[in-house]
Regions:
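Flexible, acidic/Gly-rich N-terminal and inter-domain linker regions that tether
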Residues: 1-337
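Radical SAM enzyme [4Fe-4S]-AdoMet core and its adjacent flexible, acidic
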Residues: 13, 25, 29-51, 56, ...
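N-terminal pre-triad scaffold of radical SAM enzymes
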Residues: 266, 322-364
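C-terminal accessory regions of radical SAM enzymes
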Residues: 266, 575-732
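Catalytic or ion-translocation cores adjacent to nucleophile or general acid/base/metal-coordination motifs
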Residues: 335, 346-350, 364-375, 454-455, ...
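Glycine-rich, often proline-containing surface loops adjacent to acidic residues and nearby aromatics
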Residues: 337-341, 355, 397-406, 451-454
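Conserved alpha-helical substructure of the radical SAM core
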Residues: 351, 362-403, 420-424, 428-432
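Conserved AdoMet/S-adenosylmethionine-binding subsite of the radical SAM
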Residues: 387-395, 411-583
């Protein structure tokens, strides 16, 4: 025990903590007896352990799960609500006194010893445990005693929650956005007239009337370059475009962000999605969008101290990353899994159509590797040569079969740059296939079967999805299909049904028509985690031809405190809301073929929903992207800090392949940046009834959902070698 911890143990608990403690003991006489009879913390631990073991041993399935003799979805689904609590209590005892590096506190030590904290509070009135801690423990023992039950909401209730959230296709919302567009354009016209803005492409002819200027500006609205040129880069301009609707506290935070050097980049189209005149039928409906634009105090405080969440993103050329992969350089290729690697081009693709407040690459903005200096991001003359060398990595690798081109944002590259990148991918894939003809059976490499483009522009800037871009994508799809590439995927990030606008719908239709399947990766932020919000998004996306792929917990540390929704909420959403969209296995063969006929996605999804009587296709998996080991929601809650923040121990997703190096890695510890109490208080602050979320306390165990066949790689007609290329021992 460190001196600092010893000092914390002597801190008196607050009046609120005393009140919660008294309630805890009053409801649990057996616990009170253990605590009052224990002479020290060890006796308290032994007493609790023996008590709980006596209960759990009566359920062999739960006991085997606790002992880790069984695992997986089937074993998880056999657990009762009380089993969740018993396993957590035993894990608390087994991990008592463990120290963890807490990056939420910039690497300070966090210690979990909840039974000791209760004993100190009972015996001495000390331990320094906060009310958030005691509230969590109160709910835990209620769950263990059977006083706190879980009532699954009906489908009707989930659909009632969904109906609270309008989409951007609602005629009333469309009308509001038209008003916003008019206000924004009139401000831009005024600034051009005053000479505050001068541009060689966007200007007015002498003698034009105000009506003529407005009609010309309306034409500009359909031009992606207009939105990039007139993107807001300062708090004052943002407030002006939003009709001076931002309150003084928000402006103070934004001024701090500007002073700290955090980039601002909000284009006029995306700004028009924010409410200025809040309609009675959509109060709070734009919060998931607003929280992507407006920075939090925690982000500002941590900017400059943000550490890379992704251990495998820390790369030294020639040395293995955390997952064991050797990469050619530090910036352009990222890799975690055997089958897929990320390519980040040295083009405009290093920029985005806007900066998301909870961006996973905020670390790269902090160190200047990503930015919005668009002119400086144009490709240099040496890029074509470098691209060929980078694609050589994919060509020579024995297991890579999937290339994800992202950034930044893949579609921020110009049509010409993107066409050259895709031509390079085509040549690489062709060379890889040709080289296989010379290899013996059992020695053949994986060939490229999937190409993905990572982009948020269908959301941020749907004007980018032009007929010319669709032509580039369609041409590549046609010729690449002839050499064995079978899956062409646009991987995007819709965060709210309010982002699904007529412009976004038309952009997706154009992408589908080019033969590309559009999938969505939803970030489960605080506003997006409200009851029914994620399910409504799934439904609306299905209606415009998008398949749901992942629902990601917000990753990062204290910089993303504000937007973080706890992993317990992610499990709750999976078990209680998304479940009404569960796809029966009888439709698996049908849905597996959806990407082969992307042009008919809307019709095929609609037909399947009608026949299966589902409100949406729950084809996504709720996961957290873990440092080093990838996506998983397989965890157990093994600890809790005196501030009530839970400590989760994650395992690999055993349903997919991993680097052999990861088999030797320890489990991954995640200390959540906020307690359940703090999360619920945030929800209450944005108008939610916390009683709707009552079961969240009990979801202390998670299990990754199986991947549906829709997202599996096509099978080869030959056996791929077992050998791994570019694999080494990871850097410590």
């Amino acid at each position: 025990m460190t001196a600092n911890t010893h000092e914390l143990d002597r801190i008196a608990i607050t009046v609120k903590s005393h009140m919660l403690l008294r309630q805890l003991l009053r409801e649990n006489p057996a616990l009170e007896e253990i605590m009052r009879n224990a002479c020290n913390e060890t006796e308290a631990l032994v007493g609790v352990r023996n008590w709980v073991l006596g209960e759990i041993i009566e359920n062999p399935d739960a006991y085997k799960f606790y002992k880790r003799d069984v695992h997986g979805r089937e074993a998880f689904e056999k657990l009762t609500w009380k089993d969740f609590a018993a396993i957590r209590l035993l894990d608390y005892v087994d991990n008592a006194g463990r120290e963890f590096d807490d990056q939420n506190l910039r690497g300070e030590k966090a210690i979990s010893n909840p039974i000791q904290l209760i004993w100190l509070a009972v015996t001495h009135g000390t331990g320094g445990a906060k009310p958030y801690f005691f509230q969590d423990m109160l709910m835990l023992f209620r769950q263990f005693s059977g006083e706190y039950a879980r009532d699954f909401p009906t489908r009707e209730k989930v659909e009632e929650w969904m109906d609270r959230w309008p989409s951007g296709l609602d005629p009333r919302i469309i009308k509001l956005r038209e008003e916003n567009r008019e206000r924004i354009l009139k401000i831009i016209i005024d600034k051009i007239d005053k000479g505050e803005i001068k541009d060689r492409k966007f200007f007015f002819d002498p003698g034009m009337s105000q009506e003529q200027k407005y009609l010309r500006a309306l034409e500009w609205w359909n031009d992606r370059l207009f939105h990039l040129r007139f993107a807001v880069r300062s708090p004052d301009l943002l407030n002006e475009f939003l009709g001076y609707s931002l309150d003084p506290d928000t402006m103070k935070v934004l001024y701090e962000a500007e002073k700290k050097g955090i980039p601002f980049f909000v284009n006029p189209y995306y700004m028009s999605l924010l409410h200025v005149r809040v309609p009675y039928f959509a109060v709070g409906a734009d919060l998931a969008i607003r929280y992507y634009v407006v920075y939090s105090q925690q982000l500002i405080d941590e900017y400059g101290h943000i550490v890379a969440w992704e251990k495998e993103d820390r790369v030294e050329p020639g040395k293995p990353n955390a997952a064991g992969w050797i990469l050619p350089n530090e910036h352009n290729i990222h890799r975690r899994y055997p089958e897929v690697a990320i390519l980040i081009p040295d083009t405009m693709g290093r920029a985005c159509g806007g900066l998301c407040a909870s961006c996973q690459r905020m670390y790269d903005f902090q160190r200047g590797n990503l930015n919005f200096n668009l002119d400086k991001l144009k490709p240099k003359q040496t890029w074509d040569q470098k691209l060929a060398e980078l694609l050589g990595y994919f060509e020579q690798d024995s297991q890579l079969r999937d290339i994800l081109i992202t950034g930044g944002d893949a579609l921020m590259s110009s049509d010409g740059s993107l066409a050259r990148i895709l031509d390079g991918v085509y040549r690489m894939a062709l060379n890889k296939r040709d080289a296989n003809e010379k290899r013996a059976p059992g020695e053949k490499h994986a060939e490229i079967v999937r190409v993905r483009l990572g982009t948020r522009l269908p959301v941020y800037l749907p004007q980018r999805i032009t007929p010319e871009l669709a032509q580039v994508l369609g041409d590549f799809k046609r010729k690449a299909s002839e050499i064995g590439i079978r899956q062409f995927i646009i991987q995007t990030h819709f965060e709210s049904p309010m982002e699904v606008t007529p412009e976004a719908r038309d952009a997706v239709k154009r992408l589908n028509a080019a033969g590309w399947t559009v999938t969505n990766q939803h970030v489960f932020s605080i506003a997006a985690s409200r009851r029914g919000h994620a399910s409504k998004l799934r439904k609306v996306l299905n209606e415009i031809g998008i398949l749901n792929y992942y629902t990601f917990s917000v990753k990062g540390y204290m910089e993303n405190y504000f937007n973080f929704a706890t992993n317990e909420r992610a499990v709750q959403e999976q078990m209680e809301e998304k479940v009404i969209g569960t796809i029966d296995e009888e439709y698996y063969d049908e849905i597996r073929e959806f990407p082969s006929n992307a042009e008919m996605l809307v019709e095929n999804i609609t037909s399947l929903l009608k026949r299966s009587k589902l409100p949406f296709l729950g084809s996504d998996r709720n996961v957290l992207n873990l440092p080093g080991v990838g996506k998983s929601l397989t965890f157990r809650t093994i600890g809790i800090t005196r501030y009530g923040r839970r400590i989760l121990e994650f395992e690999l997703d055993h349903t997919r392949n991993h680097s052999p190096v990861l088999e030797k890695m320890d489990k991954v510890i995640i200390i959540e940046s906020k307690s359940i109490s703090e999360y619920l208080r945030q929800l209450e602050d944005i108008g939610e009834e916390t009683s709707d979320y009552e079961s969240i306390w009990g979801y202390s165990i998670g299990e990754t959902e199986p991947r549906i066949p829709l997202y599996e790689y096509p099978e080869y007609e030959y056996e791929v070698t077992d050998e791994f290329s570019n694999l080494g021992v990871p850097v410590a």
